Amino acid sequence: MYLQKFNLSGRTAVVTGGGRAIGLACSEALSEAGAQVYIADVDMAVAEEGRDALKQKGYAAEIAQMDVTDPDQVTAVAAEIAAARGGIEILVCNAGIARSETPAEEVADEHWLNVIDVNLNGVFWCCRAFGRHMLQAERGAIVNIGSMSGFIVNKPQEQSYYNASKAGVHHLTKSLAAEWASRGVRVNAVAPTYINTPLTAFAKANRALYDVWMESTPMGRMGEVDEIASAVLFLASDAASLMTGSVVSVDGGYTCW
């Protein structure tokens, strides 16, 4: 009974930025649970790389080129996938960028706009476009990738624009959850700690920075992509059928202090 709640057979799942790192792990987790996964990425080479990685493990993912900052393209891709599959049951908004170590007074206009456009606007465009199809079917689960940076101010690096974008994702998640709960669509988020991905590779080259990160984390380590994908799988599945508007911290205890 309980394991069956994680079975996603017959469902269509779209993962933005699903070809690498956390996104690829989410694509694999959802595929393993039985979903038909679409990897949506602005870079088709990355999407193809992810598709090939899944194929080597026995999963047949589809790919779609999609720039999350282009609302018209997002709407078109959502319509194409919904038409091809007869609906969309799961959306994972994972696409994002990170910029840090810039004092707020020195942040360039284009850097602020770029981070907000990808990390926050992109999540809204995707939730709106794919959510429309879920609302029509009165069924769906959306999982947004937020960050512990949406709860706390990271140290010692300065990253006001990234923090603001992720705080926005958290509150957008709650707002959409409240609006759509009675219409069959659940919206939740996962808030990861520092995860071993190319986005955090710079920290290991800076021992002083890395040591501060680890000293600030009760578990004393960075996370792995599969640890985030496991939380995403749970929230996307019927095992989380009573959960909506939740932002689940997967941070090794970082936000405890």
Predicted regions span which residues?
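Residue(s) in the substrate-gating loop at a strand-loop-helix junction
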Residues: S147
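A conserved structural motif in NAD(P)-dependent oxidoreductases
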Residues: T217-I228, A239
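Active-site helix of classical SDR
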Residues: C127, S165, T173
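The beta1-alpha1 cofactor-binding region of Rossmann-like NAD(H)/NADP(H)-dependent oxidoreductases
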Residues: M44-A45, A64-A76, D109, D226-E227
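Short C-terminal tail/terminal secondary-structure segment
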Residues: M1-K5, A98-E101, V232-L233, T244-W257
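Substrate-binding pocket helix/loop in short-chain dehydrogenase/reductase
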Residues: T102-A104, A108-I116, W213
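Alpha-helical segment proximal to the catalytic Tyr-Lys
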Residues: R132, A178-S182, S241
